[in-house]
Amino acid sequence: MNQADAWKLRSSRYEAVQFSREINKQLSELRPDNVMGAIYIAKDYAVIAACTLATLCVSWWLYPLAVLLIGAYQRGLTTIAHDAAHRTLAKNTTWNYVLGILFAAYPLFQRHWAYRISHVYLHHPYLGDPEKDPDLKFFMANGVYDVQPPKRYAFNIIWKPIFGGATLAYLKYLWTNRFSITDSEDQSRSSILVDKYGFYLFWIGILAGSYALGLLHIVILFWIVPYLTTFQVLGWFVELAEHSPMCESETKNVYLTRNRKGNFLERAILGQNLDEYHLEHHLSPGIPFWLLHKAQKIRMQDPGYAKVAASWGGLFVKGPQGQPSVITQLKERNRRLYEQSLADAHAKGHVA
C-alpha cells in the first residue's frame, strides 16, 4: 500500500464539537486590541537585531546560532502575518494591515491576500479534505501519508527535511499558497493588485536602501540566508505537526489538529508567538494568538475537551505526562500500516 485511503472528509465538512453557553460566553470576551500585536513584532525584531549585533560585534562563531534563532523568530513573524490574514492582529482594520503586511507578510516574501485566500478561504473551511485543503495536499504530495519501510519513512520526513531536503518543496508551497494564489471570487481585483505591487515596492525599497547605506550584505546574511535555510526547515516541521496524521481518519474538529506540549527548548525554537496552540486557533479563529492560552484554559472546563488535551505531546519530545510526540505518532502510524501491508501481501501469496 503506497497511499492511505481512509479520507472520511473527502468532499465533506468536519463535525464541529459544541461547547456550553458559559464557555462560549467567556471565549467571546477574548478579542484583539491595538497594542499587543505591535509588542510581539517589536520583540521579534529586537531578537533578530540582537543576533545580528552579537555576530558582528562579538564573534562570527555565533553566526550558526544566529541563523537558527533568526529563522525561529522569522517563523514567529509568520504568526503575525497569519493573524493579520484573519483580521485578529489588531482591533483597528488599517492598523491590522499595516502591522501584518509591512512587518510580517512582505518581509517573509508573502502577500496578504494570497495568505488570506489559501488559509482563511481554503484551509479552514476544507480542513481534512484531501482534494481542497492546500496544507493537506502539500504533505500528501510530499510523502507524509505514504506507507514506506520504517527507516526510509523516518529519513524522508525527519532527517531529509532537517538537512534541507524538503526546502525546495516547501518554498514551492509558500510561493503557491502565500504569494501567487489569487483565485477567490469574493476578493476585489483592486485589493489584490495593490497587494501585489505593494510587495514589489517594499522589496525595491529595502534592497535599494540597504545598498545605498552599504548594508546589503547584512540583509543577505541575516535575513535572506536564515529565510532560505532554518526558516524553511522549521516551517516544514511546525506545519507538519499542525494536522498530521489526524486528517487521515478523524471527522471532528477537536481531533483534526492539536496543541503541542513541548519542553522549553522546543517551544523556544518551534513555538514562537504561541505557535503551539493550533487547535485553539481552529476552534476560535477570531481570537488573537496571544490569548489562545487563555482560550485553552477556558475550554478545559469541558470534560471531553480536557480528555483530548491530556493526549498531546510535543513535536519531537514527549509531553509532560509521557504523551507521544508528533514524530512518534507519525512513525508509529507508518510502522503499523507497513506491517499490515506486509501481512496482507503474505496472506495473498498463500492464497495464490
UniProtKB/Swiss-Prot annotation:
Compartment list:
Cell inner membrane
Q: Which GO terms describe its cellular component?
A: plasma membrane
Give TM regions: 53-73, 89-109, 204-224
Catalyses which reaction?
Answer: dihydrorhizobitoxine + 2 reduced [2Fe-2S]-[ferredoxin] + O2 + 2 H(+) = rhizobitoxine + 2 oxidized [2Fe-2S]-[ferredoxin] + 2 H2O
Q: Which UniProt keywords apply?
A: Cell inner membrane, Cell membrane, Membrane, Oxidoreductase, Transmembrane, Transmembrane helix
Q: What is its main location?
A: membrane
Knockout phenotype, as recorded, reads: Mutant can produce serinol and dihydrorhizobitoxine, but not rhizobitoxine. Mutant produces no symptoms of foliar chlorosis on G.max cv. Lee and does not accumulate rhizobitoxine in the nodules or upper shoots. It shows significantly less nodulation competitiveness than the wild-type strain on M.atropurpureum.
Main enzyme class: oxidoreductase
Q: What does the protein in this record do? A: Involved in the biosynthesis of the nodulation enhancer compound rhizobitoxine. Catalyzes the final step of the pathway, the introduction of a carbon double bond into the C3 position of dihydrorhizobitoxine to produce rhizobitoxine.
What protein family does this chain belong to? Belongs to the fatty acid desaturase type 1 family.
Please identify the protein, giving its name as recorded: Dihydrorhizobitoxine desaturase
Q: Which organism is it from?
A: Bradyrhizobium elkanii
